[in-house]
């Protein structure tokens, strides 16, 4: 009889927990992205803007499996690392983030420069590479306001597991094109929602649906899983709008139900 843990270890699965937060079981490793575990209704003053969480996470921190690593796209915004999420990250044995984020978190956090790779390795497991992908949290010129951010590519040298791109909060399509020039991308967790605030006018700080359709093309048509699109009040494009634009473009989109696992395709397949 195969145990649930063994099944999880053998499968390549993504489980979105809400907002940008996802559990990724890949090549026998378990990773968590951008931990957000505070309760719905929590508000945060972030510089000139207020951010408000509108949905509870699908799992509480106490319900998480053992984590091999946590990847944090940036530490300065609570919709990517809230109070409870920061506690989860601080307690992890391995954390990968931006250089500035590592200084912020301290402890086990490792800051990665663009295109820098670190590898998870243990006896009996396929090594898993974590490569930092350049990102920009808004249009050119907003960097001083938004701060540094990074995406991540999770990949194996032997190609035995699907290659998974976690975009982080970015609208940098040129970086995605550069990523596709370097690596095959089988699955893309794209941070959607077209995040915006009245104080910033028409500036959007994460991908619009139109940008996401183009991002998929540039990345080589991977399976797209929508994250960072529900659960916070500052997302300006809702599910129906995003789905409508993807359907109009004839582009498939996997919109997850929080807490429900998604089995990833085999490498080289769509």
Indicate where each model-derived feature is located.
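Divalent metal-coordination and catalytic microenvironments
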Residues: 24, 34, 74, 82, ...
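Metallo-beta-lactamase
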Residues: 2-9, 94-161, 245-267
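Structural motif
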Residues: 29-31, 68-69, 94, 128, ...
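Cap/insert and terminal regions of metallo-dependent hydrolase folds
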Residues: 53, 100, 171-260
């Amino acid at each position: 009889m195969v145990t649930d843990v063994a099944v999880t270890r053998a499968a390549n699965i993504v489980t979105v927990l809400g907002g940008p937060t996802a559990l990724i079981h890949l090549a026998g490793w378990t990773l968590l992205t951008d931990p957000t575990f505070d309760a719905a209704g929590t508000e945060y003053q972030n510089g000139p803007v207020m951010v408000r969480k509108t949905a509870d996470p699908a799992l509480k921190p106490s319900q998480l499996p053992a984590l091999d690593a946590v990847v944090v796209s940036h530490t300065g915004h609570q919709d990517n690392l809230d109070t409870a999420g920061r506690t989860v990250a601080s307690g992890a044995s391995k954390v990968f983030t931006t250089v500035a984020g590592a200084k912020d978190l301290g402890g086990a956090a490792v800051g990665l420069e663009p295109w820098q790779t670190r590898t998870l390795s243990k006896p009996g497991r396929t090594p898993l590479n974590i490569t930092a992908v350049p990102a920009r949290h808004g249009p050119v010129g907003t960097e001083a306001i938004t701060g540094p951010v990074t995406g991540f590519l999770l990949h194996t040298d032997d190609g035995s597991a699907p290659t998974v791109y976690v975009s982080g909060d970015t609208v940098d399509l040129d970086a995605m094109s550069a990523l596709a020039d370097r690596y095959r991308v089988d699955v893309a967790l794209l941070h959607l929602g077209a995040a915006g605030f009245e104080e910033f006018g028409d500036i959007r700080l994460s991908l619009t649906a139109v940008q996401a359709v183009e991002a998929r093309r540039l990345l080589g048509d991977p399976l797209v899983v929508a994250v960072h699109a529900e659960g916070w009040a500052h997302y300006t494009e809702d599910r129906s709008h995003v789905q409508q634009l993807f359907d109009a473009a004839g582009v498939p989109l996997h919109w997850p139900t929080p807490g429900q696992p998604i089995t990833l395709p085999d490498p080289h397949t769509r």
